[in-house]
UniProtKB/Swiss-Prot annotation:
EC number: 1.1.1.-
Keywords: Acetylation, Endoplasmic reticulum, Methylation, NAD, Oxidoreductase
A cellular component term, taken from the record's GO annotations: endoplasmic reticulum
Binding site for NAD(+): I19, D64, Y163, K167, T198
N-acetylalanine modified-residue sites: A2
Localization terms from the record: Endoplasmic reticulum
Record-linked Gene3D superfamilies: NAD(P)-binding Rossmann-like Domain
Main location: endoplasmic reticulum
Protein name per UniProt: Dehydrogenase/reductase SDR family member 1
Enzyme class: oxidoreductase
Annotated source species: Homo sapiens (Human)
Amino acid sequence: MAAPMNGQVCVVTGASRGIGRGIALQLCKAGATVYITGRHLDTLRVVAQEAQSLGGQCVPVVCDSSQESEVRSLFEQVDREQQGRLDVLVNNAYAGVQTILNTRNKAFWETPASMWDDINNVGLRGHYFCSVYGARLMVPAGQGLIVVISSPGSLQYMFNVPYGVGKAACDKLAADCAHELRRHGVSCVSLWPGIVQTELLKEHMAKEEVLQDPVLKQFKSAFSSAETTELSGKCVVALATDPNILSLSGKVLPSCDLARRYGLRDVDGRPVQDYLSLSSVLSHVSGLGWLASYLPSFLRVPKWIIALYTSKF
């Protein structure tokens, strides 16, 4: 089996489950040495064992990415053990999902102000810390890739105020880091997965109360055809092995766009759902859902329309 990332060194934060786990599995399958982080060593070891069975090497490291001292220690370990080499950093760690589920349908003034920290400390704050220390290894080498996991919640209202602000800041983090890193040969991008079948969401979607909420009921129907966690991993591998990656630096990269660009399918063989297709967009618009089934899948929402729709001017 081809190992296109053999010899490369990667760090994936928040990899004990969910998207981070899926990314770690695919990076190891591609032959890389992958450092995975999380807060519980036992779950990290389970992922590491699974990842190594696919190829590559996987090193579990307990690290709370909201704590700068722990982030610094992580990258010092990578520096020491890999002779200063770091090829790919994936800023994925996120601890806000349960808070989002617990505060659903509540306005920002109806929730504790501390919800900001619950959603963005292990997330935006940690992503910045990791980017700082990761770049210190990449810049001297004149190469590297930083991937920030974000979402369309950065463009339009989604879930709550701290979530949207945090995701918008993630996209800006990637764009501004890319600006400063470009002359050093280091790329930085923002990756938008679609709806993803994470363990936590699977558990939540199985609850009976979901059927009583019209919004969640609609979400559940889309969830059955959602992306697996490993599709994001396939996207990261494709980006990391793209010789023209600098041309994408600073951009927001939806997973469905990357699937089209690199000819990717999900790990179970399914085609990747294109959430930027006209039919997909219309299926979520009240009164226009009937029209979606009549539109061919190749018709997509032009990016300039998205830019106009989300313009703040």
